[in-house]
């Protein structure tokens, strides 16, 4: 149905309506298998599925139900609605935008808001209405994007797309050109159609009786695996069936689980060995000590910067000293389950204290002296300990803490200064002056265990996590978990008594328990570093290597510190277990580059799950260098360890496990969960849940009746911990985390509850409203940003500042005093890591249509805004108080700390957003600036500008001065800007050209040919020789003599089977070199050439895909200038110049091609002046051809007649099959046969037979226009890359289609890991870099070429103006030729028979030494 075009006024009104419809639009992305490439790249693939009978029946049932409710629907409406539901389930978004089109194939955006509680019929009705509304208000897609971009502020990035997901009725879909033009930023396009037996597409908008319904999913292989797309199709069909069963039920509860998914996902009903208690960790340790008392247990190391011996403690010494403390606790009334608080430091005494508390049957908890006293008091108030153990080396308690302990706690005992001496003797300190050591009375019991029995449900640990009301939560651990998983881990990760573990975790964080208990369980060693070795970047790696550590537990932040500025490898390290925060691919790579043998194990869990965690292994680079290439930037959480399940549960209907890709909440189901929260039964009941999936009566309790610990076993409890994390299942069954269901987050390993920060902020008297978010800065680092609306301020509270147009900068300036005050206030309430790095004052909070704070609309200050605010601060009085050194240091801080706004000389580097990683960068910036060897640990001891400046001044003037040797810069050949060089070279081309004559077909002609003995040159020569008896060819050949030159030419022709002895009479040779002046031809011969030559075919060039422009400039550019010079002298001559489509190898021309073809054009016009590639060409060869073309076209303006011939890939002869084995595509063919795989790349390939290209070149020489024109040589039709390589299996070669990412990884393994001499090795950089993008070519208009070939048909009696192509027949011919010459093996599988080719012995003999010009890998 045609529609009348709207008036300009109506059209603008439509654009305004669309602008309103798409306001604050959420553009959803589907979950991917691979990281999104930046910038966007596309490797298209297609997956097709025919609807099964149950899905077709379900469509009819929905249709009938909708009709009964008066909803006029079509099958397409139903499927579109199903797709919207699936997208919402995959993304968690409630604002869904899908690209679709009207019945007139006009694309538009269908945007709908969706709630899980919506009924299917209600949503279906809404979608139908929105589809009608969008169809009737159609506008051009590009016009809409331009209209929306025109409304953006200068700070906003322009929109490139309006949707990432598209769903079309195939007959109504926009043109294929539109789909490809707009496809770069699209995740998935679904085309739905009905196929009749006639194979004609039938619309889904009108009928329900159909034989076959087809889904065609077009997806980006750089984002999705085929298995993922297969599952998406399954889920789409499953949702159709589910909806048909309950059209009025909530869409959030629709089942999308399929048998395929169930095979890889955990079964939430299985027995997880609930009664499999392994024993208490302290008893296992005591048993180990009895078995091997003299084995090394704890090794305390000195700093690597000093030469001192280690202090080593045996299992007996740790066992005996912990017995002493345990007996002291028991004799002072400590009972099973009492909390003993340990004021600790990282060292052997902590191990003694922990094991002593456990042996007493008590619960240990740790306070870190680094916490502010107020925070320590909070921990004490929550724990209510009955004993306090202070480690002597941890320092003394703060007076305020001591006062709290004395007034508020009822301690049974207090150990003031626990210390294990180097000889193994233990002291506890004296509680009063002159009194005996507090442990004196139990020293005689050191060899005796306490005998206190604990069971799986006894409480060994009390660990703290962030709380929502400003009060930390105390998590009560259980003994079950502490030892249960170690046997499995030892087997799975090859851990043993020979290992040397590290003690690197934060002492008050529960990961420290892994550090201690793992080696003690295994009978291994625990190596303890100094604080200096941990805190000084680069030093920790030295320490790890020096002491040959083999296993470590790290947070990602600690891993970054280990790898930062490290240059000493750690070959001994074989496993690194990461916990506590998201682990990135970059984190893994940094560590694995340092430790080539380390397997990185990402472990997902929480304090509440104790040792019950998931795991995902990144194998060592010594085993698999390519593994990380297929991983996304964030490493998955993986799957549960032995008898641990990660259940991703539907948030709307918790009775359902989520399908693969569906976002849900992560629950951990295991027997090793913690007991709950101390003193908070209500929260415990919300987070530790009895499983509703299984019948507990079917589980068997295998606890022995006589087990002494049975009284401390609560029986089988099938429990799950509700993590609050959002996640998804991957197609493998692994889980990836995708955010938080609440506001709890982790930054640098610390778990932070945003609610806690918001609570404290809201209590500040000058804060009316506030919200805290996590944003990613320009380096993708998570950053805490607090937004506040100030209140109750006086004029004196405002900082004077010059007004700026930027409201963010104004706020940061105006409220600087308030920001500083809030920061100081939060320091008294929160640990430093929980204080927002950026505080942004606002006049009011932006609200969304639902009346909630519009989080996406909150401004995130960028670097320039923060710098502007800081500059303003500097201008208003700060500079006057800073020395020159201090000013320089401040400037460095502002440059490297992304969000520093309140920088003064006394501010701590770490308080304003610095951390250990940035500290490393700071030190090197200081070294570079001041040319002194600033110690790497200086910022930790002097974290202020003032302190750093004093130390640097001292170094500059004193003994420590050490000018840095920054080395000499490598001498480089200066780069030449090819576009500018072309302009400069115009002066070298002749000022004018004599007019060439149009000779008749029978008139004598002399052709000068360069590159005659190259691959294409051979076929150009053959084409010339078969044209006329009155034609002579003078060939330029690089040789020692004319005789030698003729032999070389003859050998090349013979090698490709084209030589005819009769040619010798019509061919003469001149010796020369393209790079030399006049090609090195002696003057007499040069002068003769100017008088006898009628046509110049300049085909010669140095083809190399790595050489820079500067190396190719001589033969390719200066050689072309020589050709122009020859044309300008003597008689008039026309020029046929062989260029390459590598001159249009830029994104500009790909986009221009898409734009032209989307409007019905044929592609890049031959008249285009190529300014779109005057920069951004990436190969020196393409650049040299661009400059040469430019000069030839300039010569055309000065009278030259000629044609620039622009071919793409030049493949074999369509008659004989002879082909250049050094061609890129031929190497691809051989490489894929070697690998047994070929990549699924959907790009079209512009490849043409060599004989057709030769015909275009010669025809262009004989039929030039006035001036210089371009003749594109393009394939008609073009095969796609996967079709081209797919012919291998057609003809019986053992190759299989592979997803591109998998093919790329397999190739890299094949070439690098297995050291195979692949045919692709010389081009590996090109293939592995980005083959799909490198092979993506613009479409080309070839009008000029067609006209030239039509004119030439009267000379040759053969009309080839319709072009040529390489299809299955030609590929068979080429493959047969390559087999015949021994380049390829014979096919081994059944397939089409290769056509017969005839190759004589002379050809085989000469082939080995033939010169060749390969087809361009850049077209």
UniProtKB/Swiss-Prot annotation:
Subcellular location field: Cytoplasm
InterPro entries, A to Z: AA_adenyl_dom, ACP-like_sf, AMP-bd_C_sf, AMP-binding_CS, AMP-dep_synth/lig_dom, ANL_N_sf, Condensatn, Far_NAD-bd
Disulfide bonds: none
PANTHER family: CARRIER DOMAIN-CONTAINING PROTEIN, L-2-AMINOADIPATE REDUCTASE
Name this protein carries in UniProt: L-2-aminoadipate reductase
The EC number(s) this enzyme carries: 1.2.1.31, 1.2.1.95
Natural source organism: Schizosaccharomyces pombe (strain 972 / ATCC 24843)
Reactions catalysed according to its record: (S)-2-amino-6-oxohexanoate + NADP(+) + H2O = L-2-aminoadipate + NADPH + 2 H(+); (S)-2-amino-6-oxohexanoate + NAD(+) + H2O = L-2-aminoadipate + NADH + 2 H(+); (S)-2-amino-6-oxohexanoate + AMP + diphosphate + NADP(+) = L-2-aminoadipate + ATP + NADPH + H(+)
Record has Ion transport as a keyword: no
CDD domains recorded: SDR_e1
One cellular component (GO) term of this entry: cytosol
Function: Catalyzes the activation of alpha-aminoadipate by ATP-dependent adenylation and the reduction of activated alpha-aminoadipate by NADPH. The activated alpha-aminoadipate is bound to the phosphopantheinyl group of the enzyme itself before it is reduced to (S)-2-amino-6-oxohexanoate.
Species lineage: Eukaryota, Fungi, Dikarya, Ascomycota, Taphrinomycotina
Gene designation per UniProt: lys1
């Amino acid at each position: 149905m045609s529609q009348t075009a709207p008036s300009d006024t109506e059209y603008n009104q439509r654009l305004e309506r669309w602008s309103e419809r798409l306001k604050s639009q959420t553009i959803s992305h589907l979950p991917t298998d691979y990281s999104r490439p930046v910038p966007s790249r596309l490797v298209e693939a297609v997956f097709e599925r025919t609807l099964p009978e149950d899905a077709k029946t379900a469509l009819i049932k929905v249709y009938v139900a909708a009709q009964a409710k008066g909803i006029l629907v079509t099958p397409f409406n139903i499927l579109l609605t199903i797709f919207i539901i699936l997208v919402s389930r995959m993304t968690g978004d409630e604002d869904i935008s899908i690209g679709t089109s009207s019945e007139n194939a006009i694309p538009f955006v269908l945007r709908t808001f969706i709630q899980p509680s919506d009924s299917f019929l209600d949503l279906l009705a809404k979608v139908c209405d929105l589809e009608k509304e969008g169809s009737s208000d159609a506008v051009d897609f590009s016009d809409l994007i331009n209209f929306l971009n025109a409304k953006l502020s200068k700070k906003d990035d322009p929109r490139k797309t309006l949707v990432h997901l598209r769903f079309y009725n195939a007959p109504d879909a926009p043109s294929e050109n539109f789909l490809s033009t707009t496809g770069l930023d699209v995740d998935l396009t679904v085309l739905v159609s009905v196929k009749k037996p006639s194979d004609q597409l039938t619309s889904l908008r009108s009928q329900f009786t159909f034989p076959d319904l087809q889904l065609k999913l077009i997806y980006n292989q750089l984002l999705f695996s085929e298995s993922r797309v297969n599952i998406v199709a399954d889920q789409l069909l499953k949702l159709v069936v589910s909806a048909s069963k309950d059209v009025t039920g909530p869409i959030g509860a629709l089942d999308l689980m399929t048998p395929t998914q169930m095979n890889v996902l955990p079964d939430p009903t299985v027995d997880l060995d609930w009664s499999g208690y392994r024993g208490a960790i302290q008893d296992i340790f005591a048993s180990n000590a009895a078995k091997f008392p003299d084995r090394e247990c704890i090794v305390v190391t000195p700093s690597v910067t000093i030469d001192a011996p280690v202090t080593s403690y045996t299992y007996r010494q740790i066992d005996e000293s912990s017995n002493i403390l345990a007996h002291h606790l028991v004799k002072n009334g400590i009972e099973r389950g009492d909390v003993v608080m340990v004021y600790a430091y990282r060292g052997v005494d902590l191990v003694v204290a922990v094991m002593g508390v456990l042996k007493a049957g008590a619960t240990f908890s740790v306070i870190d002296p680094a916490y502010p006293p107020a925070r320590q008091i909070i921990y004490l108030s929550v724990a209510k300990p009955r004993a306090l153990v202070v480690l002597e080396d941890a320092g003394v308690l703060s007076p305020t803490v001591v006062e709290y302990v004395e007034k508020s706690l009822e301690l049974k005992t207090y150990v003031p200064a626990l210390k294990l001496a180097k000889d193994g003797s233990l002291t506890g300190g004296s509680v009063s002056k002159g009194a005996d050591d507090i442990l004196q009375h139990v020293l005689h019991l050191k060899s005796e265990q306490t005998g206190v029995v604990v069971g799986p449900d006894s409480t060994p640990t009390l660990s703290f996590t962030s709380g929502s009301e400003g009060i930390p939560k105390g998590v009560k651990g259980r003994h079950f978990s502490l030892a249960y998983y170690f046997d499995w881990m030892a087997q799975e990760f090859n851990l043993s008594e020979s290992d040397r573990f590290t003690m690197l975790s934060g002492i008050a964080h529960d990961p420290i328990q892994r550090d201690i208990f793992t080696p003690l369980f295994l009978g291994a060693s625990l190596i303890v570093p100094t604080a200096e070795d941990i805190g000084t970047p680069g030093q920790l790696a030295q320490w790890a290597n020096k002491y040959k550590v083999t296993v470590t537990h790290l947070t990602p932040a600690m891993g970054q510190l280990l790898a930062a500025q490290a240059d000493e490898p750690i070959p001994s390290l074989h496993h690194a277990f990461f916990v506590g925060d998201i682990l990135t691919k970059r984190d893994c790579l940094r560590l694995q580059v340092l430790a080539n043998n380390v397997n990185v194990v990402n472990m997902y869990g929480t304090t509440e799950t104790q040792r019950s965690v998931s795991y995902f292994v990144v194998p060592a680079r010594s085993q698999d260098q390519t593994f990380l290439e297929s991983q996304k930037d964030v490493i998955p959480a993986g799957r549960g360890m032995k008898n641990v399940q990660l259940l991703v549960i539907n948030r709307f209907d918790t009775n359902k496990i989520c399908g693969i890709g569906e976002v849900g909440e992560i629950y951990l189901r295991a027997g090793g969960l913690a007991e709950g929260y101390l003193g908070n039964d209500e929260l415990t009941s919300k987070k530790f849940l009895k499983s509703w999936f299984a019948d507990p009566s079917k589980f068997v309790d295998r606890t022995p009746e006589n087990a002494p610990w049975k009284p401390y076993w609560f029986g089988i409890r099938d429990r799950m911990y509700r993590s609050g994390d959002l996640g998804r299942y991957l197609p493998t069954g692994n889980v990836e985390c995708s955010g938080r269901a609440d506001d709890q987050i982790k930054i640098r390993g610390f778990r932070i509850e945003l609610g806690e920060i918001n609570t404290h902020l809201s209590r500040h008297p000058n804060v009316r409203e506030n919200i805290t978010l996590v944003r990613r800065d320009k380096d993708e680092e998570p950053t805490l940003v607090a937004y506040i609306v100030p209140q109750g301020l006086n004029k004196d509270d405002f900082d004077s500042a010059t007004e700026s147009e930027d409201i963010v900068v104004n706020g940061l300036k105006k409220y600087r005093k308030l920001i500083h005050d809030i920061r100081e206030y939060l320091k008294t309430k929160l640990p430093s890591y929980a204080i927002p790095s950026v505080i942004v004052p606002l006049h009011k909070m932006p609200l969304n249509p639902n009346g909630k704070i519009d989080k996406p609309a909150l401004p995130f200050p960028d670097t320039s805004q923060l710098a502007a605010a800081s500059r303003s601060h500097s201008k208003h009085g700060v500079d006057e108080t800073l020395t020159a050194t201090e000013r320089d240091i401040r400037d460095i801080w502002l440059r490297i700390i992304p969000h520093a706004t309140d920088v003064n000389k006394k501010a701590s580097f770490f308080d304003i957003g610095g951390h250990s990683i940035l500290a490393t960068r700071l030190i090197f910036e200081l070294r570079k600036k001041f040319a002194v060897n600033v110690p790497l640990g200086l910022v930790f001891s002097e974290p202020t500008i003032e302190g750093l400046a004093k130390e640097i001044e001292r170094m500059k003037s004193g003994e420590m001065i050490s000018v840095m040797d920054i080395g000499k810069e490598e001498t480089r050949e200066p780069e030449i800007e090819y576009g500018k060089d072309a302009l400069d070279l115009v002066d070298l081309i002749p000022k004018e050209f004599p007019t060439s004559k149009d000779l008749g077909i029978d008139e004598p002609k002399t052709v000068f040919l360069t590159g005659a003995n190259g691959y294409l040159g051979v076929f150009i020569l053959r084409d010339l020789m078969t044209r006329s008896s009155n034609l002579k060819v003078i060939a330029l050949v690089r040789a020692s003599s004319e005789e030698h030159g003729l032999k070389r030419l003859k050998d090349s022709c013979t090698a490709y089977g084209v030589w005819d002895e009769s040619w010798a009479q019509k061919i003469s040779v001149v010796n020369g070199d393209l790079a030399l002046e006049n090609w090195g031809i002696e003057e007499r011969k040069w002068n003769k050439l100017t008088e006898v030559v009628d046509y110049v075919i300049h085909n010669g060039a140095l083809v190399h895909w790595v050489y820079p422009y500067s190396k190719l400039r001589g033969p390719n550019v200066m050689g072309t200038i020589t050709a122009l010079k020859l044309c300008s002298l003597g008689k008039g001559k026309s020029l046929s110049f062989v260029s390459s489509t590598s001159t249009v190898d830029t994104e500009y021309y790909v986009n221009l091609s898409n734009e032209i073809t989307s409007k019905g054009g044929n592609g890049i016009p031959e008249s285009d002046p190529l300014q779109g590639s005057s920069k951004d060409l990436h190969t020196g060869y393409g650049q040299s051809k661009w400059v040469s073309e430019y000069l030839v076209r300039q010569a055309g303006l000065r009278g030259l007649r000629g044609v620039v011939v622009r071919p793409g890939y030049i493949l074999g002869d369509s008659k004989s099959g002879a082909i250049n084995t050094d061609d890129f595509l031929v190497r691809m063919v051989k490489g894929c046969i070697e690998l047994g795989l070929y990549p699924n790349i959907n790009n079209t390939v512009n490849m043409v037979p060599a004989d057709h290209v030769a015909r275009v070149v010669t025809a262009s020489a004989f039929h030039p226009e006035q001036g210089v024109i371009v003749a594109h040589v393009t394939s008609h039709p073009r095969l796609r890359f996967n079709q081209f390589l797919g012919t291998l299996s057609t003809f019986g070669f053992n190759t299989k289609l592979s997803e591109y990412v998998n093919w790329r990884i397999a190739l890299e393994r094949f070439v690098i890991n297995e050291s195979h001499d692949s045919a692709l090795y010389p081009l590996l950089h090109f293939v592995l870099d980005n083959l799909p993008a490198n092979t993506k070519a613009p479409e080309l208009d070839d009008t000029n070429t067609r006209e030239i070939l039509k004119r030439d048909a009267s000379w040759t009696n053969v009309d080839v103006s319709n072009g040529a192509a390489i299809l299955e027949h030609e590929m068979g011919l080429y493959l047969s030729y390559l087999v015949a010459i021994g380049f390829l093996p014979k096919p081994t599988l059944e397939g089409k028979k290769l056509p017969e080719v005839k190759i004589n012995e002379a050809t085989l003999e000469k082939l080995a030494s033939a010169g060749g010009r390969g087809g361009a890998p850049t077209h």
